[in-house]
Amino acid sequence: MSQLLTARQAEELHKSMIAYLLSVNLSKSAAALREELADSVHLDDATAKKYEGLLEKKWTSVVRLQKKIMDLESRNAALQQELDSATPTSLSRRNQDPASWLPRAPARHSLQSHRGPVTCVAFHPIFSSLASGSEDTTIKIWDWELGELERTIKGHTRAVLDVDYGGPRGGTLLASCSSDLTIKLWDPSDEYKNIRTLPGHDHSVSAVRFIPSGAAGSPMSGNLLASASRDKTIRIWDVTTGYCVKTIQGHLDWVRDVFPSPDGRFLMSGGDDRVPRLLDASSGETKSTFIGHEHVVECVTIAPAASYPHLAALAGLKKPPPASSSAEFVATGSRDKTIKIWDSRGTLIKTLVGHDNWIRALVFHPGGKYLLSVSDDKTLRCWDLSQECKCVRTVSDAHGHFVSCIRWAPNIINESGLVSGEGGINGQGTPSMNGVSISTTSKKEDTGGGGKIRCVIATGSVDMNVRVFAS
């Protein structure tokens, strides 16, 4: 027996070899191998069926990994050469404070494979995986560093409307929702196997977000998932059981978006009734309503604590709320072409005007100073909260058609195991769903939620492309 394999691994290999020989009609060779192994491998028809594709799958996986290693080595060599020949100007850009980094054209990667409009994107909280969903009913998993398609996930029967990574500590899941009325959970650690389907909504499911585990008083443990639907409800699910644990009513029409606070205590929602709501995630009670939009509210988001100093000044407060407080400020985007920033009581602080079409998605910069928006006017805009929300950068023609979604890559996890990344909330200071320590963080790059800012965003569009903007 090979000294490299355990007894169990050797047995698995032998079963795979025999099953492969049988699958290609080499029964004599299979029988000879059995004889050589002294009949130590017991393989009935059902077991043979299970193992027959395993050898080929592992072989192609090795080839794929070898290619990825070669690509990474090539890229590493190119980056080293670039670093060796760098000018002071290029070095100053490379050493730019991540808290002030903003995306600029051209995109690092334009990812093409979908056959319908891209509706949603989400970053894995640790690995360089990016999920995108489309009206073509598929989810695609990309390596955003290499710009390569890793796999296509099929399972939904109608348009995929949203995706999100998160879940229990140490067990990251991918959630997706669809016009087929279902939510599906996929396991990234098991080749994105569909582990659960959550039926219950009576119409299209527009948005899904994992509710982070965080401060005391928050919903328990990171097992919870929030969904918003055209059936006018928000539902909260326990992903470990698949049960709906709460149905929240109050909206009068289609609920387009739902977004959890970093500590999981609150949910922000918005939709066709034009009145966004701040909800208590535990009780479902409406804490505040936000009245002022003149058309459908397409997107909502909650400001991270890093934004409090800028938004408090904008609101005329003498000092910002404590960083430990939750959902002190929120932002909403609408088909009325405006973005509105509010305090948690429902008081309008600022209306941002500049887009020429529907606002489709929002994300706060993890550093806290900026708010980014994308729109059906094909642009990505960056608003400086410290300058009265002045638009300080416009990426014109960010896509060739309506821009439907934007996400910020999760922060690099620090020693404490916290990540200001996704796990459900667009890289805006979420406690980690995975207690894995990856790197330390300099004070300059710390966002306050823990973790080093990753200067990477992804956008999706009706042009069927996903684009990655990076420093």
Swiss-Prot record:
Biological processes annotated in GO: cell division; establishment of mitotic spindle orientation; microtubule sliding
Source superkingdom: Eukaryota
Residue ranges that the Swiss-Prot or TrEMBL entry lists as coiled coil: 60-87
GO cellular component: cytoplasm; microtubule; microtubule associated complex; spindle pole
Record has Isomerase as a keyword: no
Subcellular locations according to the entry: Cytoplasm, Cytoskeleton; Cytoplasm, Cytoskeleton, Spindle pole
PROSITE patterns cross-referenced by the UniProt entry: LISH, WD_REPEATS_1, WD_REPEATS_2, WD_REPEATS_REGION
WD repeat spans: 113-154, 156-196, 200-247, 250-289, 292-352, 354-393, 398-428, 429-467
GO molecular function annotation: dynein complex binding
Stored CDD domains: WD40 (cd00200)
Polar residues biased stretches: 83-93, 428-441
Keywords, alphabetical: Cell cycle, Cell division, Coiled coil, Cytoplasm, Cytoskeleton, Microtubule, Mitosis, Repeat, Transport, WD repeat
Record keyword Coiled coil present: yes
Domain LisH residue range list: 9-41
Protein's job: Positively regulates the activity of the minus-end directed microtubule motor protein dynein. May enhance dynein-mediated microtubule sliding by targeting dynein to the microtubule plus end. Required for nuclear migration during vegetative growth as well as development. Required for retrograde early endosome (EE) transport from the hyphal tip. Required for localization of dynein to the mitotic spindle poles. Recruits additional proteins to the dynein complex at SPBs.
Assembly mode: Self-associates. Interacts with NDL1 and dynein.
Name under which the protein is recorded: Nuclear distribution protein PAC1
Protein species of origin: Coccidioides posadasii (strain C735) (Valley fever fungus)
